[in-house]
């Protein structure tokens, strides 16, 4: 582990492609933390995770896992990491049991009793050929093969992609049940904010190759608000700290702030506006507002 106790540490990481760049990205994951990496399709989530896993080299910056450099100590860094991606494939002709024995022969930390428990929880049959698994069952099989190794870091890259709403809900419910008594660290990427909100305690927003915000989930939900205001004729709403969007239509204004405090009511009252309603925002609404505000900022 790193000297400051971090499980994952990415510092000023950049990677340039022809039509996309990951720009000066920094990310840190603490022990026992579950971080949701949220971004639109093409935002850089998978690129970030592939660099973290050593599958793609960074052009610049530093990546450390359990204190080990991914550039010079990749084998040591990945020893305690379990990785599941939506594009991972198993041997179609082989059974799940064959895969379990294969993984157990490679990883000494394989826990057969835990594997049996996961088989039951995920409702999987070890004798079934992998080619006969549904997409949801395939994802569960991948999770079983990773979780039964008892990794200290679990990296999930868009694991619910392609699942119907019911299958996605069932998978996340089962995954949360499996993980609720665990102390491992998890990095979970998705473009679906509802998925991330269910499983994560810290949220990181990424857009166009940049981290645009990162905070504890509850901090996001408690600090963001949408305000409905009555605006008197001729009144001009002042620029208030934390306000990311203002929309005025006639005598009605909608204000979105990332730093809500009751004192904001007086600020607008002094300007000739009256706050009529204060609404909490969903994580999806917060994500969209964060991304749109970031895109309005001058390019760095």
Feature annotation, model-predicted:
Residues 172-261, 277:
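ABC transporter nucleotide-binding domain
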Residues 20, 75, 113-116, 218, ...:
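Generic alpha-helical secondary structure signal
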Residues 19, 197, 240, 270-272, ...:
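Alpha-helix termination/capping residues and helix-transition junctions
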């Amino acid at each position: 582990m790193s000297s400051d106790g971090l499980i994952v540490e990415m510092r000023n990481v950049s990677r340039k492609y022809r039509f996309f760049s990951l720009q000066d990205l920094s990310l840190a994951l603490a022990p026992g933390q579950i971080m949701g990496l949220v971004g639109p399709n093409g935002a850089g989530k998978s690129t970030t995770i592939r660099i973290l896993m050593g599958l793609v080299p960074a052009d610049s910056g530093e990546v450390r896992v359990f204190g080990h450099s991914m550039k010079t100590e990749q084998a040591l860094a990945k020893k305690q990491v379990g990785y599941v991606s939506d594009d991972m494939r198993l041997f179609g002709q082989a059974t799940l049991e064959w895969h379990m024995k294969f993984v157990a022969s490679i990883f000494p930390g394989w826990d057969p009793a835990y594997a049996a428990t996961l088989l039951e929880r995920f409702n999987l049959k070890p004798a079934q050929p992998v080619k006969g698994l549904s997409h949801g069952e395939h994802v569960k099989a991948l999770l079983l093969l990773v979780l039964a190794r008892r990794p200290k870091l679990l990296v999930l890259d868009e694991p619910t992609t392609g699942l119907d709403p019911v299958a996605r809900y069932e998978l996340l419910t089962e995954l949360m049940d499996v993980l609720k008594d665990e102390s491992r660290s998890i990095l979970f990427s998705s473009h679906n904010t509802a998925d991330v909100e269910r499983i994560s305690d810290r949220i990181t927003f990424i857009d166009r190759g940049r981290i645009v915000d990162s905070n504890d989930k509850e901090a996001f939900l408690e600090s963001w608000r949408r305000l409905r205001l009555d605006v008197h004729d001729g009144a001009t709403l002042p620029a208030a700290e934390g306000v990311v969007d203002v929309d005025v239509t006639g005598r009605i204004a909608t204000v979105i702030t990332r730093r809500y405090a009751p004192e904001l009511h007086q600020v607008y009252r002094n300007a000739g506006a009256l706050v009529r309603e204060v609404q909490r925002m969903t994580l999806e609404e917060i994500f969209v507002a964060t991304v749109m505000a970031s895109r309005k900022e001058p390019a760095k």
